[in-house]
Amino acid sequence: MLSLLKRAIGYTNERQLKKYMRVVEQINRMEPQMEKLTDAELRRKTDEFKEQLASGKSVNDIQVEAFAVVREVAKRVLGMRHFDVQLIGGLVLAEGNIAEMATGEGKTLVASLPSYLRALEGKGVHVITANDYLAKRDRNLIGQIHEFLGLTVGLNLPLMSPQEKKQAYQADITYGIGTEFGFDYLRDHMVYDASDKVQRPYHYAIIDEIDSVLIDEAKTPLIIAGKTRSSTELHYIAARLVKRFEREVDYIYDGETKTVNLTDEGIEKVEKAFGIDNLYDAEHQVLYHYVIQALRAHVLFQRDVDYIIRDGKVLLVDAFTGRVMEGRSLSDGLHQAIEAKEGLEITEENKTYASITIQNYFRMYPILSGMTGTAKTEEKEFQRIYGIDVIPIPTNRPKIRVDLPDRVYMTRHDKYVAVAKEVKRRHESGQPVLIGTTSILQSEEVAKYLDQEQVPYELLNAKTVEQEAEVIARAGQRGRVTIATNIAGRGTDILLGEGVNELGGLHVLGTERHESRRIDNQLKGRAGRQGDPGSSQFFISLEDDMFRRFAAEETEKLKAKLKTDETGCILNNDIHEFVDKVQRIVEGMNFSVREYNLKLDDVMNEQRNVIYQIRDRVLEENDRVALVVPMIRSACDRIVDAYALSEQIPEEWDVRRMTEELNRIVYRTPITFDQPPADLEDVKRKVAEAVESYVALLEKKKAHTQLQTLLKSVMLTVIDDYWMRHLDQMALLKEGIGLRHYQQEDPIRLYQKEGFEMFKAMYEVIEKEISVHTARLLQSLEQEEGQS
């Protein structure tokens, strides 16, 4: 077995494989022993394992027997036996790494092993799937193993009630989609009572299709937002204005980072249109926001690629799956800018209440693991950002899929003509063909060329997503032609129909190289599952987006040297080297963008952690007076520092304003000063005496239940209000960072520095506002007591 594995993977992982195979051999030796156990004896193993862990043993100590138990139960309950390579996958996951397993190798069954082992620790296991359909399917299938062994299995889906969610999270193992776990985290930090939280502390997660979740979806932050009114008229005016803008004249578009910035000429046009002198004055910050969002909508978002319009509404499309993202909308007025661009009715704008990136959410798990068919190409990113390794797992049966060399054409038209003819040729032989496209627009374009060749097909894209799994599952039937946007239906096995093996299996035809070899490999992986025959080939053109956006000049220079046949197919062998080089450049750029965005979000993440920790203390502490007292002291010190300046003489101080500010905070011990005060020490002494007297009063009142309850409400309201305002300010700061970049300043350093200053200022306001509200609370409570 080991020699077979070596040949399959290569010698770089030989040491790791030897280590895993030694454990697999131990598990295999236990199989006869497990087969002799009764169902009841197998069930009792769970309690035995828990007792061993409680007595000081580690999960590694019980791993071999636990895996052997799960394998035996899977045989009895599901009629499925884990192969040796699946056991290796389970061991990789249990360690907190990524198991790279080919399509069709039974990743779902693999997850049953580490999820059981880690659930025995009693801290909860989260199994993350690509969509709701897979979460339900896997919970119902693999959940049978765990429930047989006495563990509880939960399902976490959108639109569940808080009570249902709490129950799901209390289960030993919880299935669901990653975004919903992230949204629950944000919602838990918006509650006003600790008992309303649904999650418990994080422990261990297994992410299916981990590359899709942590890399592809990482560009889109999770945002909880509410509705707020925006200026409909300004959106329409800005949309009309930028429609007349010219690239490189009025704005600069960076195709690599997908950013746009106004040039000096563009700025002048905006100032002239609105009759203002300086667009960058603080008073025009909101106007700048409307204009830049209109420009983004105009340049960065393409209809039927990034969004579709259905029933007069803009619906976003997931760039990586081609699915419509139901219920999702862009924040900060960008969605409304797209509506204005399309001349649609403007909906209410979303105001951000809470947000977090996918990366920073999953970095909170102490142990993170995952499975995918394609991760090795992004191993450095997984190591740098998440500290996890990618371990390739050999296939159970040798892979016999044939990956044919790319066919590269000069023009898109020539490419699509060739695609249609190739599909027709294979269709006439009865071989099923799966055509992978990168957008809805491209799907529909391919469909037109197939119509011309009178080839019947099924079109699967964001507009027809309802039967996705069924359509993909049928794609391996004889004579079937399926056009699928990107990796739609991922997680659904394509089973070959009768007689298809003899025809060469499923043929996958890619119509464009993706921005990552990993996604190309995902598409190829739809064919040749579990040792089935199959083939793949990409048809690409030098007019494809990848070349236009990232290598326009080099492509134009190269064209003059190229030779083609009568179909427009390029004959030069070095064209393949050029294509690979451009794709690697794009991969590097995309990684840099993700890394840049993560560095920016790390600033927000630190701030979010501070605010959420304070919020949690307010929720969980019984004595909130103890939390307020340091705030009162700090707020009073800052008032003195603001008005009694050491570089001025006391006669120059604004003593009246200082006294007013202090007396709003210090209740029942009014502060007065000589006119003018003797010196700064005199001021500080009097303030300290008054504050300590007031603190003593608060200490006496802290047993008052109503005071503690009202303090909790006031503190949370103030924190949430100013945190939401701060999120808006940070979004505007981030927006302006692009302009600074244009001015050759380091954007990340500036964002860190200015973001910290803004956070510090916000926190000081929070302390002051809570202090003022505390004084008012105390006053109203004493008045109530006096009246009763």
UniProtKB/Swiss-Prot annotation:
One of its GO terms (cellular component) is plasma membrane. One of its GO terms (biological process) is intracellular protein transmembrane transport. Its EC number is 7.4.2.8. It catalyses: ATP + H2O + cellular proteinSide 1 = ADP + phosphate + cellular proteinSide 2. It is an enzyme of class 7 (translocase). It is a peripheral membrane protein. InterPro entries: Helicase_ATP-bd, Helicase_C-like, P-loop_NTPase, SecA, SecA2_Bac_anthr, SecA_DEAD, SecA_motor_DEAD, SecA_preprotein_X-link_dom. Keywords: ATP-binding, Cell membrane, Cytoplasm, Membrane, Nucleotide-binding, Protein transport, Translocase, Translocation, Transport. It is found in: Cell membrane; Cytoplasm. Its main location: membrane. Pfam families: P-loop_SecA, SecA_DEAD, SecA_PP_bind, SecA_SW. ATP binds at Q86, G104, E105, G106, K107, T108, D493. GO terms for molecular function: ATP binding; protein-exporting ATPase activity. The keyword Cytoplasm applies. Belongs to the SecA family. Monomer and homodimer. Part of the essential Sec protein translocation apparatus which comprises SecA, SecYEG and auxiliary proteins SecDF. Other proteins may also be involved. Part of the Sec protein translocase complex. Interacts with the SecYEG preprotein conducting channel. Has a central role in coupling the hydrolysis of ATP to the transfer of proteins into and across the cell membrane, serving as an ATP-driven molecular motor driving the stepwise translocation of polypeptide chains across the membrane. This is Protein translocase subunit SecA 2. It comes from Geobacillus thermodenitrificans (strain NG80-2). The lineage of its organism: Bacteria, Bacillati, Bacillota, Bacilli, Bacillales. The gene is secA2.
